[in-house]
């Protein structure tokens, strides 16, 4: 994969249920308030450790607030050698609205 793929909330939820990796790029306060269970909070500070410990062949889904910033982050992960990276359209706002039961603080 040379470029990330944008996926819907429903596709992301299905992949998450199958064990897909979710990385959340929102600010620390937003992440602490609520996030996808099991998501990794990815920041400039946590990025090096995430990359060092990553399985580059495992699909990675990037979530932000509304699905815009995640596109740049997804493309960056592709440039770092990740094989399958997805940007979640609608972001966490859409996830929380559609799947409130699959949101944790």
Swiss-Prot record:
PROSITE patterns: RHODANESE_1 (PS00380), RHODANESE_3 (PS50206)
Compartments reported by the entry: Cytoplasm
Gene Ontology MF, one: thiosulfate-cyanide sulfurtransferase activity
Residues annotated as signal peptide: none
Record's catalysed reaction(s): thiosulfate + hydrogen cyanide = thiocyanate + sulfite + 2 H(+); thiosulfate + [thioredoxin]-dithiol = [thioredoxin]-disulfide + hydrogen sulfide + sulfite + 2 H(+)
Active site positions: 64
Pfam family of the protein (one): Rhodanese
Keywords: Cytoplasm, Transferase
Domain Rhodanese span(s) in chain numbering: 16-104
Enzyme Commission code(s) on record: 2.8.1.1
A GO cellular component annotation in the UniProt record: cytoplasm
InterPro entries registered for this protein in UniProt: GlpE_sulfurtransferase, Rhodanese-like_dom, Rhodanese-like_dom_sf, Thiosulf_sulfurTrfase, Thiosulphate_STrfase_CS
HAMAP family: Thiosulf_sulfurtr (MF_01009)
Matches recorded under NCBIfam families: PRK00162.1 (NF001195)
Family: Belongs to the GlpE family.
Protein function: Transferase that catalyzes the transfer of sulfur from thiosulfate to thiophilic acceptors such as cyanide or dithiols. May function in a CysM-independent thiosulfate assimilation pathway by catalyzing the conversion of thiosulfate to sulfite, which can then be used for L-cysteine biosynthesis.
Protein name per the record: Thiosulfate sulfurtransferase GlpE
Species annotation: Pectobacterium atrosepticum (strain SCRI 1043 / ATCC BAA-672) (Erwinia carotovora subsp. atroseptica)
């Amino acid at each position: 994969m040379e470029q990330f793929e944008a996926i819907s909330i429903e596709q992301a939820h299905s992949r998450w249920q199958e064990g897909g990796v979710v990385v959340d790029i929102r600010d620390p306060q937003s992440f602490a308030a609520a996030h996808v269970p099991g998501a990794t909070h990815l920041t400039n500070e946590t990025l090096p450790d995430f990359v060092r410990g990553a399985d580059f062949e495992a699909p990675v889904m990037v979530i932000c607030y509304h699905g815009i910033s995640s596109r740049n982050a997804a493309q960056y992960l592709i440039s770092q050698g990740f094989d399958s990276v997805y940007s979640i359209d609608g972001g966490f706002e859409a996830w929380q609205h559609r799947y409130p039961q699959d949101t944790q603080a």
